[in-house]
Amino acid sequence: NFGYLTRGGYSKKINGKRTFIKKDPNQYYTYTGALVDYSQVVELKTPFRGYTAWHKYSDAQIKSLHAWILFIGERDSIDIRKGLPEWVKEKGAEGFEFNSDAYYGKVKGLLNHTNTRKDKFDMFPQQELMDMLISL
């Protein structure tokens, strides 16, 4: 999973300046310029962190993440229903956005970088991921 995708090319720093490298206008590309198969593209109805196209989490990735969350929650006595799963239940995709209480350590539970840092893109609100989080 590469995160956000761009259509028609990708941005690259050349001589210290961001430049858009044009490619096939009908294709999606990762931030490194790798072509992404259409079956691995998720188009969000509402942009997340400025992007609507994202590299899809596979069913196997979501299943593995589910098992990992359960394991870490049990091992470290973390209430995995608090934090991100709670916010996704309340606000849907907006639950993935920055949360100042999480940033300042006032929230105990399951968090991710996008909740605590405005410059991170490591998780995005794919419906299957949100469904898994709500099921916790």
For each feature predicted by the language model, list its residue ranges:
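Basic/polar, cationic surfaces and motifs that engage anionic cell-wall
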Residues: 3-136
